[in-house]
């Protein structure tokens, strides 16, 4: 554990300490609890490890409280001109573990430049900065894409106005989210809306994330029903029994066919969100290249706001 090491007296020594901890794994009472080089599962330990390290060597480490709150960290960085580390690839688990150390280096430099103590840096991040970032209350745009997401919905989830969820980083604010509840429910149970653009959180196990809300409950559509449906029985995700469901893009035809199934159950699909389809101009006469811009592109862009 951390207590087996000497306290670092430089950034280089602090980095060596951190690399050693994430590489050698975790031992508990003499037993190897997490194997060496298991960086994928080490991701789950980074946040609590940051608490211990920030007490052991506060000069170089800080408590990381932005897990599932990466949106706030990004806003703080934008507001105060802080360059965050490059995002490692999803499967680069060691690089993702090292993301925390790279943040430590960046905030160490920020602290020194601004004459802050370790405690003052923590107060800056989790009090001053959080209170100064803009909580934008913008309208939800019309959806341009529909996505499947999945996972159990527990009673506490259903009582929340919004919740943090795994999804595709390409998800845009306002997009439609078709929620498949996994076993033992094994059915599509509701349709939700993405309240934010998708982002990547390197220290979040599932990488891509969004905030979702505006849940509309629908009649359950079971996996068995979809497997028996003429259209969905041929759909690759249904054939995979919704494995890898989170962030699976739906075509406009997929969503239309889903509305068909929902309507057949007697549900008023007029209450459900519709995919945005721009109105194309009528009586278009294209003769030269400039006509494309004036008669098609400009009206299309105007209709999109």
Task: Identify what each model region corresponds to.
Residues 1-26, 30-33, 63-145, 259-280, ...:
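C-terminal accessory module of base-excision DNA glycosylases/AP lyases that mediates lesion recognition
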Residues 141-160:
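Short, basic/aromatic beta-hairpin or loop at an interaction surface
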Residues 159-167:
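Short alpha-helix capping/helix-loop boundary micro-motifs
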Residues 171-175, 187-190, 304-305:
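Catalytic centers of nucleases
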Residues 181-187:
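Short, charged beta-turn/beta-strand-edge "cap" motif at the junction between a beta-strand
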